[in-house]
Amino acid sequence: MIDLEQFSQSALDACTVDGALLAVPMSVTGRIFYWNTCTFEQAGIDAPKTYEELLTAGNTFREVLGEEYYPLAMDAAARMNLMVSYLESTTGKAWVVDRQLQYSADEIKTGLEFLQALEENHVMPTLAAQQTNGTLDQTPMWQNGQYAGTFAWDADAETYRSALKNASGFLVGDEIAFGGQANGGFSKVYLALASTAAASTRKKRRFWSTFC
């Protein structure tokens, strides 16, 4: 028997469909900020720890380093996750509960305006302007520090660090609180283990005794 008490309920819930536990969560990953402090030093400022500092950093980058430098860059999925974090922080409500969206059209509009504000304040480029052929870590703009930050899974830390030409400035950033209602965040099960119904009882016992 597997002792399910060693797993958090939220992780178990993520592996549960229609009341049935389909897998056992082995690891969880969440979105966090990564910064290239070498570029921030060139701009004469520290990596941001608040929303206000993040907005200020965008304008400072533009004025000091030029139009091609941004404090942040991320793909469409990460932008959506960041918007959810913002909405959770400002409304105190989860994105989805029991497969039902919890936000009104006006609240989602507010979330999109948040992303637009980041673009207008030169915090991050628009998706159209962002030069990405492949993942962000593979682009020259990340590697040479023109894109000085991203919002990515903590499981990908080494991927982003090792891609930098100067990795000495790689920093795992602080949580940025966007509102006082809750600490918004986005996480998912990174690795889960399951055995098929067709597997023999002996094989199942060996499998679970090995990994759990």
What are these regions (language model features)?
Residues 51-55, 128-143:
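Short helix-initiation/N-cap motifs at beta->coil->alpha
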Residues 22-23, 63-76, 122:
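Bilobed periplasmic-binding protein-like "clamshell/Venus-flytrap" ligand-binding domains
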Residues 42, 121, 163-212:
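Extracytoplasmic/periplasmic substrate-recognition and gating elements
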